[in-house]
Amino acid sequence: MAREKEIEIQTRLGKQRILPSKVIYFPRGIMGFENQHEFTLLKLREDAPFLVLQSIDDARLGLLVADPYSFLSDYQIKVSDAEQKLLRLRNIRQVAVLVTVSIPPGQPDKTALNLSGPILVNHEAKLGLQVPQVEGKYPAQVYVHPQNETKVAAADARHPDDGGAENW
């Protein structure tokens, strides 16, 4: 079997090498960046609960994302039949759910998860889709408070199917 050749991409964090099989195609782009279709997930650190959803074509476009279930065990989203079809979902184990994260400069205690625009990734088909939520149990943003020990430990971030983001 031939070994896959890495590609080099530019990011705000410098050059990164990734495998082409790690590229995720977003047919609709991401809200606010509808013309950007190819992204990859990059780890910041081995033990970090956050990833960067990095544009392949625009070094300046990298969104901080996290697995919401690491912080909210009962987070629920609604996905239409059309969205499931676009993602080519055959079963729930194919999908990873991510949400964008905002950390105000100098205020890590105000870190917030954006729950109104979850990003779904079919890791088998390498397809992604942002699925806006209009109704939900949670407000649009939920603050992550590190001192709150009742939440699942952030270091235990997991994708539902593969045991962790480290397999991306």
Swiss-Prot record:
Gene3D superfamilies found in the cross-reference section: BH3618-like
Alphabetical GO biological process terms: bacterial-type flagellum assembly; regulation of translation
Role: Acts as an anti-CsrA protein, binds CsrA and prevents it from repressing translation of its target genes, one of which is flagellin. Binds to flagellin and participates in the assembly of the flagellum.
Keywords: Bacterial flagellum biogenesis, Chaperone, Cytoplasm, Translation regulation
Subunit structure, interactors included: Interacts with translational regulator CsrA and flagellin(s).
A GO cellular component annotation in the UniProt record: cytoplasm
Entry-linked Pfam families: FliW (PF02623)
Lineage: Bacteria, Pseudomonadati, Thermodesulfobacteriota, Desulfovibrionia, Desulfovibrionales
Subcellular compartments: Cytoplasm
Family: Belongs to the FliW family.
InterPro entries: Flagellar_assembly_factor_FliW, Flagellar_assmbl_FliW_dom_sf
Alphabetical list of NCBIfam families matching this protein: PRK13285.1-1
Protein name, entry field: Flagellar assembly factor FliW
